[in-house]
Amino acid sequence: MNISTKILNRTLLLALGTLMCTFVVAQTQHTDTPQQGEGLGAFLLRNGYNVSKYKDKFIELNANRFGKDYGLLLGVKYVFPDKQNQIEEPLLGEANKMVTIEDDELYGATYYLISGHGGPDPGAIAKVGEKELHEDEYAYDVMLRLAKCLLSHNAKVHIIIQDPNDGIRDDAYLSNDDHETCVGAAIPLDQNERLQQRCDAVNNFYKTERTGYCRTVIIHLDSRTESTRIDVFAYHFTKSKMGQRLAQNVIDKLKTKYDYYQPGRGFLGEVKERQLYVLRETNPPAMFLELGNIQNDKDRLRFIKPSNRKAVAEWVAEGMIEDFKMSK
């Protein structure tokens, strides 16, 4: 084979490779033609696209293919935008930061997630042999897992208490530190200042997002006598009907899950009214969760086992999805 033939063959292979790549792209680009009398919104919905999310991009991709007021034209093939299928949240840690969007069940919902204590305040402390379990570390891990669940259903999530070094951890005994911040700001030692700081952070975000469904979720672990076992329970502010409904939906979902996975166990989680600082001072409807007694060895299994932390977060998220559906 002479040099000219080799060059020609390489050129043909490169051209073929380019055509193959183009073909693959073309194959993955979704197109469709409208049905008689079908409007733009119905066309998007029939093809599995959220109207408010994808309408503008659809119009941009199909410029000059519309009738009056963006009416669809029969016989015209319209191109659909690529769906966003992943979102990045670095606070979840290297292994979890890329979250796949599984569906749009929470599209339009905004959540402000606060894990209890943090920074100079570890919260309740339990001793297991030589190990110290700090409330803030376990509440933070469950909160991150909850954030991941909510993001996977296409919610908007603000993580208020943050530790850039931790991410979701799969250890039983979580290392303790004081690196947590409130949206990047140092957490004060004074309790009232600390609580007001996180309320201010939520309210500042809420100023620009208050037209939609917005909820605050605060996660803590309780500390009682070693012999006291408790189930997850939830607080809402006395005058907040929306906070009460959210709390009740979550507790109802937890009861359903425990009844299914542990028949005969029973579930005594409750919803109660409280005038706690963060419930009173955050403007969006809020729910305050206590996940169990950190001093009780059986309750601790709910926190020590990573699979249990994951399950609790997922079940809470399912209850939150139910509440969002009720708001529509």
Predicted regions and their residues:
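Short acidic beta-strand-loop surface patches of small beta-rich interaction domains
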Residues: 56-69
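Non-catalytic propeptide/linker segments at domain boundaries
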Residues: 72-115
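Structural recognition of the beta-strand scaffold that forms the well-ordered cores
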Residues: 110-114, 157-161, 213-219, 233-236, ...
